[in-house]
Amino acid sequence: MTQVTVGENEGIESALRRFKRQVSKAGIFADLKRLRHHETPIEKYKRKAQQRRRRR
């Protein structure tokens, strides 16, 4: 789970930007999008191949 603590002198805008960056980096929206619809075996294969390429 992604959490952001807001400092005393920190604005909401900067905390929101940090939160969005952490969510994007964690891949939460990609997972939600993927789980929203049925994934065919070929789509699953393509997604995993793309993940392997990203890790290199």
From Swiss-Prot:
UniProt protein name: Small ribosomal subunit protein bS21
Biological process annotations from GO: translation
HAMAP family registered for this protein in UniProt: Ribosomal_bS21
Pfam families assigned: Ribosomal_S21
Keywords in alphabetical order: Ribonucleoprotein, Ribosomal protein
GO CC annotations, alphabetized: ribonucleoprotein complex; ribosome
Gene3D superfamilies noted in UniProt: Ribosomal protein S8
